[in-house]
């Protein structure tokens, strides 16, 4: 059997239909909460004891959502979110003042009486993501314009006060604090409205059910204009605090709407037009140095000669004619100073020119030197070693001239190396270094036999002939190579300093050598480089024998100079110089291709 209390609850559910809405600029849509009606009807049919447990569990869930919202800014998946929703019904009967006074919240009491709340039905307010079970609420009209009271079925009111500024909802003697409401998501907070002072706009239709028949009907709900609230909203329960806050906000809005004049800073320009009249009246403070300079300028201007009265410019430069004379005097002063500077610079340039002329004359006088002084200087230079003289910085062609003088002197009167000038010996060492270093690194092979290398360096004559191809090369001892040339070393070894044949030498054990094509070309280039000096000295000796046959007898230095001039006229030095350059190129570059091209010519 269903009790009378359950029947009363069912009638109240039909009497106060559930509609929820959120004002414009929110994410919640007006809908009927049919699921909440079904859950409430099922919970009422079970009995008072089960209804108590469900109510207590819903209240506990309600508090846990508040505590979890305060502990973390981001809601987790397990927590429910509190969504404040307004339920409106214009047909709600106005209760008596005695009942309303009994249902008010006592601020001093901190305990909550749950025994009086057992018989209340439950509804569920659904958000887009989560649901929260709260007691059944119904909205009642109120006399005040800025306050709306919300009453429940029995003695458990929930009040939504001062929608414009602060929101406080009470359930029984328990109240929702400021921290819990502030920590709700910004999209779920209800912004307040100033329902009295603002102009009302047209409302929109909300579907609801008739209180008696249960037939759906349409109602026009007026929506007031929204006011933008400040970010820092204070929530309180007292009426006095709300009035003071609203009054202070109105005053602040009025003052904020007043247009303030823009502050204009005075410009700090040097022109008279931009400066303010107060700045013009202020005295100009100058230092003592500036005052002295101004006084000197004024005195110089006064001492100047008067300007011709007949002189007039076609176009007046200044509006004030009195300033014209002053500036003309200044211009003449500047011209005088410039003329003085020009005279000083011209005098300095003249002195510099005279000094340079004197220096040139002294250099010309020093250039003329006596013969005695030259002999002393030559003797001093000869005492210097060649490495510290100018010969060490000369080019290859200068070393070649000294080297040719040395060969001519050795051909006429061979002397020991100790009696030869260091300059000639230094030039010969530089030429030999460039030739032999390239030959040892690029031409002579490391796999050649030592006896074959010794014959190339000591024996001046080498003859060759072609043979049939046979296996094996005598120079490199590679049996797979085909030998196509046979080489004969003939002649007597000679002294490297005076180019004379030696009396005692080791006999040649092997005269004929069978060589391959690559070894033959390398040996031919190396032999021509090592014995290039000997060939030049032999040519000069032939020239001396020709002169002796013609009975041209000269003595000492005159013979060396005359032979040198004759060789120079016969272009012998030029041909030997070209040959030396070609040998250096063959030794340093790819010798095979260059040698073949040279041999074909």
From Swiss-Prot:
Could you tell me which Pfam families the record lists for this protein? DUF4211
Phosphoserine found at: 236, 238
Where are the compositionally biased (Polar residues) regions? 54-81
* Compositionally biased spans, kind Basic residues: 24-35
Record's keyword terms, sorted: Nucleus, Phosphoprotein
Location in the cell reads: Nucleus
Keyword Nucleus tagged: yes
Protein name per its UniProtKB record = Uncharacterized protein C17H9.06c
Q: What is the lineage of its organism?
A: Eukaryota, Fungi, Dikarya, Ascomycota, Taphrinomycotina
């Amino acid at each position: 059997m269903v009790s009378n209390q359950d029947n009363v609850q069912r009638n109240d559910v039909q009497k106060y239909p559930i509609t929820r809405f959120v004002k414009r600029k929110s994410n919640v849509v007006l809908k009927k909460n049919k699921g909440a009606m079904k859950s409430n009807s099922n919970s009422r049919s079970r009995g008072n004891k089960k209804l108590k447990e469900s109510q207590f569990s819903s209240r506990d869930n309600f508090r846990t959502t508040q505590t979890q919202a305060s502990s973390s800014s981001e809601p987790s998946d397990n927590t429910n979110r509190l969504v404040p929703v307004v339920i409106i019904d214009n047909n709600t009967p106005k209760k008596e003042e005695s009942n309303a006074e009994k249902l008010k919240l006592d601020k001093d009491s901190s305990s909550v009486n749950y025994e009086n709340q057992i018989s209340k039905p439950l509804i569920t307010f659904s958000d887009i993501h989560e649901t929260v079970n709260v007691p059944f609420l119904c909205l009642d009209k109120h006399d005040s314009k800025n306050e709306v009271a919300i009453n429940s079925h029995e003695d458990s009111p929930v009040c939504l006060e001062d929608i414009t500024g602060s929101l406080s909802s009470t359930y029984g003697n328990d109240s929702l604090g400021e921290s819990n409401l502030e920590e709700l998501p910004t999209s779920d907070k209800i912004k307040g409205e100033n329902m009295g002072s603002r102009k009302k706009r047209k409302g929109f239709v909300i579907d609801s059910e008739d209180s008696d028949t249960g037939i759906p009907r349409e109602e026009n709900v007026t929506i007031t204009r929204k006011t933008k609230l400040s970010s820092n909203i204070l929530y309180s329960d007292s009426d006095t605090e709300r009035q003071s806050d609203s009054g202070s906000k109105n005053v602040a809005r009025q003052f904020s709407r007043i247009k303030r004049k823009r502050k204009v800073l005075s410009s700090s320009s040097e022109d008279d037009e931009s400066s303010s009249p107060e700045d013009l009246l202020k005295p100009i403070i100058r230092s003592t140095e500036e005052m002295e300079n101004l006084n000197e300028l004024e005195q110089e201007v006064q001492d100047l000669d008067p300007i011709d009265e007949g002189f007039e410019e076609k176009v007046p430069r200044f509006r004030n004619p009195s300033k014209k004379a002053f500036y003309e005097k200044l211009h003449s002063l500047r011209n005088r100073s410039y003329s003085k500077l020009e005279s000083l610079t011209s005098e300095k340039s003249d002195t510099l020119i005279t000094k340079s002329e004197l220096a040139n004359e002294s250099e010309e006088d020093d250039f003329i030197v006596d013969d005695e002084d030259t002999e002393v200087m030559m003797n001093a230079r000869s005492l210097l070693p060649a490495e510290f003289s100018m010969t060490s910085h000369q080019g290859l062609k200068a070393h070649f001239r000294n080297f040719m003088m040395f060969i001519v002197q050795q051909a006429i009167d061979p002397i020991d190396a100790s009696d030869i000038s260091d300059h000639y010996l230094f030039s010969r060492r530089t030429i030999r270094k460039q030739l032999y270093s390239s030959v040892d690194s690029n031409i002579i092979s490391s796999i050649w036999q030592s006896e074959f290398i010794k014959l190339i360096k000591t024996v001046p004559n080498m003859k060759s002939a072609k043979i049939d191809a046979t296996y094996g090369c005598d120079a490199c001892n590679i049996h797979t190579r085909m030998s196509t040339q046979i080489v004969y070393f003939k002649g007597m070894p000679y002294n490297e300093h005076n180019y004379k044949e030696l009396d005692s030498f080791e006999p040649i054990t092997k005269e004929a050598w069978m060589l391959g094509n690559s070894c033959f070309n390398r040996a031919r280039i190396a032999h021509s480089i090592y014995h290039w000096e000997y060939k030049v000295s032999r040519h000069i000796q032939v020239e001396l024998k020709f002169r002796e046959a013609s009975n041209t007898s000269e003595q000492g230095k005159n013979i060396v100079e005359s032979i040198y001039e004759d060789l120079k006229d016969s272009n012998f030095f030029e041909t030997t110089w070209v040959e030396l350059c070609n040998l250096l190129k063959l030794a340093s570059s790819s010798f095979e291709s260059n040698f073949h091209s040279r041999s074909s010519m």
